């Protein structure tokens, strides 16, 4: 139970870390049998250029048109797995889970929440990242302090000031950058399910010309 609570808290912190930088975040449903090797924990979207109007990001239509003309991707999509400070074999398992669940996206990233792994484990993760192209970042925080933070639900619901204070507790340390690859045009249709819901949301945002809020944030599948 404590392990599930810690993982939920780590996931909530990762979501808020991404969405406070203006990225779109889609949260996949949690598997009842543990972490999934088919789908990641999050999909993180790098939106097209635009300007904020109130709480909505409105896309620059001329920039979108230029992207279409040169065949550039309309947006970036990153597949993200979140781990609660794995070590040794657990760290490698989480890395390969990230690799396995990111084949559909432009890149994959493993986010470790907790204390920074030791030097040998960091070196091992960097070596794997260099070979397979998966990014690795640690949101560093002492275990004792992480336990003192509010629960996952409170972190998800935190207002701007409260969220900023929570994220100030974290020190992002990038161990390796992701390697980008091409995204297949029919990925959403091919995978279906939650992936289909994700790509339907993104398509609706492009058609509307602005970010359309994903109503439930957490997938209802």
What are the residue ranges of the model-derived segments?
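Active-site beta-strand-loop-beta-strand hairpin of nuclease catalytic cores
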Residues: 44-79
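Non-catalytic C-terminal interaction segments of nucleic acid-processing enzymes
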Residues: 125-221
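Capsid-like jelly-roll
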Residues: 89, 93, 218-221
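Acidic-basic catalytic patches of nuclease active cores, encompassing PD-(D/E)XK
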Residues: 1-56, 221
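Glycine-rich phosphate-binding "P-loop"
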Residues: 78-87
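Amphipathic coiled-coil/heptad-repeat helices and related helical stalk/stem segments
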Residues: 63-65, 94-97, 118-121
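Conserved nucleotide- and phosphate/pyrophosphate-binding catalytic cores
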Residues: 101
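Nucleic-acid nuclease catalytic cores
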Residues: 86-91, 104-142
């Amino acid at each position: 139970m404590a392990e599930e609570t810690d993982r939920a808290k780590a996931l909530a912190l990762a979501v808020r870390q991404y969405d406070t930088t203006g990225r779109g975040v889609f949260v996949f449903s949690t598997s009842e049998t543990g972490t999934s090797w088919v789908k990641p924990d999050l999909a993180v979207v790098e939106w097209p250029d635009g300007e904020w109007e109130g709480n909505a990001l409105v896309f620059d239509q001329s920039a979108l048109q230029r992207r279409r003309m040169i065949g550039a991707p309309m947006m970036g999509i990153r597949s993200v797995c979140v781990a609660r400070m794995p070590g040794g074999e657990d760290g490698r398992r989480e890395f390969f889970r990230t690799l396995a669940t990111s084949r559909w996206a432009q890149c994959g990233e493993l986010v470790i929440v907790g204390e920074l792994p030791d030097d040998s484990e960091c070196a091992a993760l960097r070596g794997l990242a260099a070979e397979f192209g998966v990014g690795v970042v640690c949101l560093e925080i002492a275990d004792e302090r992480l336990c003192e933070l509010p629960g996952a639900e409170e972190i998800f619901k935190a207002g701007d000031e409260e969220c900023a204070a929570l994220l100030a507790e974290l020190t992002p340390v990038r161990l390796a950058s992701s390697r980008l690859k091409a995204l297949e045009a029919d990925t959403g249709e091919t995978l279906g399910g939650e992936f289909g819901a994700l790509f339907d949301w993104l398509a609706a945002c492009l058609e509307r010309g602005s970010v359309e809020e994903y109503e439930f944030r957490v997938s209802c599948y």
